């Protein structure tokens, strides 16, 4: 079964039937409107974010499968913080504040793409990204929180999400 993979970045829940997607789908004999509708349904939970998508097409049967990737850590943090873009000067200009719980949820969402093995390490990685884009966490510099996480100050909160972390497949 010869398959063709189409890898594209789409705006979550807002895929349009235009180039470069439409001509590619047409060449493969697929119904463009139907594929676009399914793409919008599959990416609706990432509305307004850039989402990596792979469409696997069986060239013989014209059957296809849509695989939705996970947006970048930056995109997820910005969405949670209600900001549209990173700070141009993250050291001095803050663009939003998140709770540590929000950061933990993003870490869990990103687990399949991370090389870290523990939730604690993943959260520290998310905090590093938050610092670089000008997002504070718990109204503090994320660097401070990294230290507090290492010291065990948030072990109870992390333990609350440990099962959820362990259930996510890598």
Curated annotation (Swiss-Prot):
Matching CDD domains, A to Z?
A: Ribosomal_L11
What this chain does, per the entry, is described as: Forms part of the ribosomal stalk which helps the ribosome interact with GTP-bound translation factors.
Subunit (UniProt): Part of the ribosomal stalk of the 50S ribosomal subunit. Interacts with L10 and the large rRNA to form the base of the stalk. L10 forms an elongated spine to which L12 dimers bind in a sequential fashion forming a multimeric L10(L12)X complex.
Q: Which gene encodes it?
A: rpl11
Provide this UniProt record's keywords sorted from A to Z.
Ribonucleoprotein, Ribosomal protein, RNA-binding, rRNA-binding
| Transmembrane spans | none
What the entry lists under Pfam families is as follows: Ribosomal_L11, Ribosomal_L11_N
Question: Which processes are annotated in GO (biological process)?
Answer: translation
The cross-references to InterPro entries, in alphabetical order and at most eight, read: Ribosomal_uL11 (IPR000911), Ribosomal_uL11_C (IPR020783), Ribosomal_uL11_C_sf (IPR036769), Ribosomal_uL11_CS (IPR020785), Ribosomal_uL11_N (IPR020784), Ribosomal_uL11_N_sf (IPR036796)
Q: Name one GO cellular component term.
A: large ribosomal subunit
The keyword rRNA-binding appears for this protein: yes
Q: Which cysteine residues pair off into disulfide bonds?
A: none
- The domain of life for this entry's organism is Archaea
Name assigned to this protein: Large ribosomal subunit protein uL11
GO molecular function annotation: large ribosomal subunit rRNA binding; structural constituent of ribosome
What is the similarity comment for this entry?
A: Belongs to the universal ribosomal protein uL11 family.
């Amino acid at each position: 079964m010869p398959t063709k993979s189409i890898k594209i970045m789409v705006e979550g829940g807002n895929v349009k039937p235009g180039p470069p997607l439409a001509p590619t789908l047409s060449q493969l004999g697929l119904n463009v409107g139907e594929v676009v509708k399914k793409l919008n349904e599959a990416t609706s939970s990432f509305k307004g974010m850039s989402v990596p998508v792979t469409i696997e097409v069986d060239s013989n049967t014209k059957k296809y499968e849509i695989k939705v990737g996970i947006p970048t850590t930056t995109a997820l943090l910005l969405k949670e913080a209600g900001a549209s873009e990173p700070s141009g000067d993250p050291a001095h200009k803050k663009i939003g504040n998140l709770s540590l719980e929000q950061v933990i949820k993003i870490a869990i969402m990103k687990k399949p793409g991370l090389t870290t093995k523990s939730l604690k390490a993943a959260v520290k990685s998310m905090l590093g990204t938050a610092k670089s884009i000008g997002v504070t966490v718990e109204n503090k510099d994320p660097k401070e929180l990294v230290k507090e996480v290492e010291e065990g100050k948030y072990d109870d909160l992390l333990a609350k999400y440990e099962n959820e972390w362990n259930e996510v497949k890598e």
